[in-house]
Amino acid sequence: NNSRILKLDMDLNYVMEFTKPVDATFDQDLSFLPCKLAIDTAGRVYCVATNVNKGLIKFEADGEFSGFIGATEVTYDWTDYIWKRFATQAQREQMESFVPTEYDNIYMDYEGFIYACTTHVTKSTLEDGTADPIRRLNMMGSDILIRNGEWHIIGDIYWGDGGGYSGPSLITDITAFDNDVYVGLDKVRGRLFAYDDQGRMLFAFGGNGNMDGYFKLPSAIDHMGYDLLVLDQQDNSLAIFTPTEFGKYIYQAIDQFQAGEYAESGDSW
């Protein structure tokens, strides 16, 4: 709660700090509450901050605030829109404004592109394809994620109200391998969804429960090689998932295809 980002050296000695931007584009009435970070090879800092919906806060390596990038597009429900047309002033003031939503988490890949995810979605926008819970941002903040798959990149395609869970997947964190396969973590049902560089779902696994490989409250995901690491916030535990033989063949096929070994890739598939 010190409203700053600290930069430390390898021995944890203080180097510098990044503090609340003093700029007309940053609401000075808001507290600066950074919660997620990504750093590029030039030392620039990209920050997700609580209550900031203009996109990622960008700092140069010297600590200077240089603006926002990657603001999400405004989405709204047509029912809410029509209701606002006929509501009284008092009723409109009580309703949520149509504003861009916040990001939950970010991950910078090996090329310097930023994968960003948000749980601020609705059933209707997920169903009609207007919501993008996962994005891939270039340095201009434009979403360049390829969506050529059969289904929208939203986790579960169908959802019900069984087992004490309801509603769609909420992608709370994301990580990406060097072969452009990325994996999103659903905090509702504890599932992991993997997609290739074209947006095709490769596999999904996981769930909530007390058995090995299941979660109580999954909150973060990362990887080491092709091993996936998932943090359980409630259990205070870290689960490590190593690829099965099936998973190894998937990664092998993708790696071979990217290396131009098309026949070998076909055999692996």
Predicted features by range, described:
Residues 1-269:
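Eukaryotic scaffold repeat domains enriched in small/polar residues
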